[in-house]
């Protein structure tokens, strides 16, 4: 009887571990219903030989970060409006918010992360759905707030490539210098 009970418990534990491993790999893409109506924030100078400075403060939502393509589509709407208004040329410097790139850690995550009511809840979903990456990042984390560092390190390698492709691609597409926050 004892062997049977141990066998059942081991089988249940193995099944739970298998289901958790399967669950962590599932990344369903939700519907994308972001507001693409835009309003430019700061426009200093006149487009011309000396160039101009254009500040863009996009209104972003968690689901805008589901994929780099969604974020790109949102930012393109702002830059297209600026181009239509004649505000962009080769000497234009477009400035985006300070931490616009930091949120790339949320790309490719489960729907629960985007529905989180608070940052801590989103961080918990990130750790739960990327257990091996997060554990490795926690071991190499540095600084006073090792947990916060680990959340970023867990996806840092992916974020670097996404950041370069996204913001570099926008700068090239619109022929401007783009200053995007970390």
Sequence positions of predicted segments:
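Hydrophobic structural segments
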Residues: 1-182
């Amino acid at each position: 009887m004892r062997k049977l009970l141990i066998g059942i418990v081991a089988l249940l534990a193995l099944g739970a571990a298998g289901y958790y491993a399967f669950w962590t790999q599932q990344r369903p893409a939700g519907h994308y219903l972001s507001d693409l109506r835009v309003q430019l924030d700061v426009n200093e100078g006149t487009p011309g030989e000396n160039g101009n400075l254009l500040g863009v403060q996009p209104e972003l939502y968690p689901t805008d970060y589901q994929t780099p393509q969604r974020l790109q589509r949102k930012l393109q709407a702002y830059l297209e409006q600026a181009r239509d208004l004649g505000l962009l040329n080769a000497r234009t410097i477009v400035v985006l918010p300070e931490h616009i790139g930091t949120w790339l850690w949320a790309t490719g995550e489960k729907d629960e992360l985007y529905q989180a009511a608070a940052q801590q809840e989103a961080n918990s979903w990130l750790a739960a759905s990327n257990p091996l990456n997060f554990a490795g990042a926690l071991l190499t984390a540095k600084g006073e707030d090792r947990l916060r560092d680990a959340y970023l390190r867990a996806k840092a390698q992916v974020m670097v490539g996404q950041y370069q492709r996204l913001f570099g691609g926008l700068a090239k597409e619109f022929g401007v210098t783009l200053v995007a926050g970390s």
